[in-house]
Regions:
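N-terminal export signals
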Residues: 2-3, 9-28
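Short low-complexity, flexible loop/linker segments enriched in glycine and/or proline
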Residues: 3-5, 172-173
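Well-ordered beta-sheet/strand-loop patches within structured domains
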Residues: 29-128, 132-154, 161-425
C-alpha cells in the first residue's frame, strides 16, 4: 500500500496494516521498535484527534516518553502495582490465548479472538465490552499495540509468535516479577543524582535522565546470554571519536581464532592488525591459528566506518572492560531480540546521547562534534563533569502514569529462565 495514512486513520484501524503502509512517509517495517513507539505515542497524545474515531483507540494509554525507568516515583508505583496484580491472580489470572490467534490482525474474525479480548482486558489494555466479541477490530488493534509497547515488542498490532508467548505468561509469574523488581528498584533509586545515564539491560535501552526526566532514550544492543552485560555503577569520563578497537583477549579466543581457521583473510578484510609485545606489526601468516598462540598478541582494528565501535566510544571505569559505543551493524536495532554483543552496549543514535553528555564540556558543541566525526580524525573529549552511569537489570516496572511494563528475564536473574521470555534469539 503506497498511500500515506493520516494521523487519525493510523489509530482508527488502518494501522493494523502497518507492515505494508507508510507512516509520515517512512515504511513501518524499516522503523525500529522505539521509532514505532514514538510515532504511536505522538499520535495518541495529539489532542486534535479527539473527534471522529472510536473511544478505544483514543483512550489507549501508552507510557509517556519523559518518564524514566529509574526514579523514586517508579519505585513507588512498581510497589503499588503489586497489589493490582495480586488482585488479578486472586481472581484466577487471565485466559491462555490459543495459537490459532497467531498472526491475527485488524479485520480477522476468529473463535480465538474472545480469549484474546479477555486476556487484554484483564491487564487493563482493553475495555472488555468494546466491539464484537469474535472480531479483531480497531479496539483490539489498539489494545494489542499497547500490550506490545508494555512488553518491549514491535508495536505493529499483529499477534506474532513473540506477542503470543508474552500474552501467555501466567499472571502469577508476572506478579512474582513485579515483587522481585520492586525490591530492586527501591535499592537502585536510593542515591540518584540530578543528571545520570541508565542502561536497563533486559530492555536493551539507555536513558539520559535530568532532574527526573528522560531527556533522551536510545535503543541498545546488550550482551548475549552467554556473554552478559554486567551491572555497573560508574561515571562517564571520556568520549573517543573515530576510535581504534583493541580486541579483548576473550574475543580473540572465542571469535577471532575460529574465524581465522575458517577464513584466513578475515583479519585483512576487516582491517585488523596484529602486534607483538614490542609493538611490531606481524602478518597473520606468522601465527598458528590451530593453537592458542594468538592470545599472546595485540589485535587492533583501524578507525573507519567499518570499525566495530563505529564513530564513537563512551568510556567509564569498570573492572569488566566494557563500554558503550556506536556500531556499523545498525540493522540489529530493529530487532525485538537485541542481545548480540560480547558484553558492551551498542547504542542507536549514539551521537544524540553524546551531545547531552558533553553539554557542559567547553569546546564540544553539536557542530564541533559533527565536524570531528565527519573528518575521521582520532580525538578524545574529557567530560568536564563526569556523568553517573548505571547498568541495571530491571525486568518489571510501573511508571507514575500507571503503565506496567515487563521484559524478558534474558539472563535468568529473576529465577524464571525462559518461562517469562517472549523473544527468542
Amino acid at each position: 500500500m503506497s498511500s500515506v495514512f493520516s494521523r487519525r486513520n493510523f489509530l482508527a484501524g488502518g494501522a493494523g496494516l502497518a507492515a505494508s503502509a507508510f507512516v509520515r512517509g517512512v515504511k513501518a517495517e524499516e522503523q525500529t521498535p522505539d521509532q514505532m513507539l514514538n510515532e504511536l505515542i505522538e499520535e495518541n497524545q495529539d489532542s486534535s484527534l479527539d473527534s471522529g474515531f472510536d473511544n478505544a483507540s483514543r483512550n489507549v494509554k501508552l507510557p509517556k516518553k519523559s518518564l524514566p525507568t529509574l526514579s523514586h516515583s517508579t519505585a513507588q508505583t512498581t510497589e503499588a502495582s503489586v497489589a493490582q496484580y495480586e488482585a488479578i491472580v486472586a481472581k484466577g489470572g487471565w485466559p491462555e490465548v490459543s495459537a490459532v490467534a497467531e498472526g491475527a490482525r485488524v479485520g480477522v474474525k476468529s473463535a480465538a479472538v474472545p480469549a484474546l479480548r479477555q486476556r487484554l482486558a484483564t491487564a487493563g489494555d482493553l475495555e472488555l465490552n468494546s466491539g464484537a466479541p469474535d472480531v479483531f477490530d480497531s479496539y483490539v488493534d489498539a489494545a494489542v499495540r499497547r500490550f506490545q509497547v508494555r512488553h518491549g515488542l514491535r508495536p505493529d498490532g499483529i499477534v506474532r509468535d513473540a506477542t503470543l508467548r508474552a500474552l501467555n505468561v501466567p499472571a502469577d509469574m508476572r506478579l512474582a516479577q513485579l515483587k522481585i523488581n520492586a525490591g530492586r528498584l527501591k535499592t537502585l533509586t536510593e542515591n540518584l543524582g540530578n543528571r545520570l545515564v541508565v542502561a536497563n539491560i533486559p530492555a536493551a535501552q539507555i536513558e539520559a535522565i535530568e532532574n527526573g526526566v528522560a531527556v533522551t532514550r536510545n535503543t541498545a544492543v546488550a550482551g548475549k546470554p552467554d556473554r552478559p552485560s554486567p551491572d555497573i555503577n560508574s561515571k562517564i569520563i571520556q568520549i573517543n571519536f573515530n576510535p581504534f578497537w583493541t580486541v579483548p583477549v576473550s574475543i580473540v579466543r572465542k571469535d577471532l581464532i575460529p574465524k581465522m581457521q575458517a577464513e584466513p583473510d578475515y583479519l585483512t578484510k576487516n582491517h585488523i592488525r596484529i602486534y607483538d609485545a614490542k609493538n611490531n606489526e606481524q602478518p597473520p601468516s606468522q601465527i598458528d591459528w590451530y593453537s592458542t598462540e594468538a592470545v599472546n598478541y595485540k589485535f587492533k582494528q583501524d578507525a573507519g566506518n567499518f570499525n566495530s565501535l563505529g564513530s564513537i566510544r563512551i568510556n567509564f571505569p569498570s573492572p569488566y572492560g566494557v563500554y558503550m559505543h556506536d556500531t556499523p551493524a545498525k540493522n540489529l536495532f530493529g530487532e525485538d531480540f537485541r542481545f548480540a554483543s560480547s558484553g558492551c552496549m551498542r547504542v542507536q543514535n549514539v551521537r544524540e546521547l553524546v551531545y547531552w553528555i558533553l553539554q557542559e564540556t567547553p569546546g564540544w558543541s553539536r557542530e564541533e562534534i559533527d565536524e570531528v566525526i565527519k573528518s575521521g580524525e582520532r580525538k578524545d573529549a574529557k567530560v568536564a563533569k563526569p556523568v553517573p552511569l548505571h547498568w541495571v537489570y530491571v525486568t518489571a516496572w510501573a511508571t507514575p502514569d500507571g503503565v506496567v511494563q515487563f521484559r524478558d528475564d534474558i539472563y535468568s536473574c529473576d529465577g524464571f529462565g525462559t518461562q517469562v521470555n517472549a523473544v527468542k534469539g
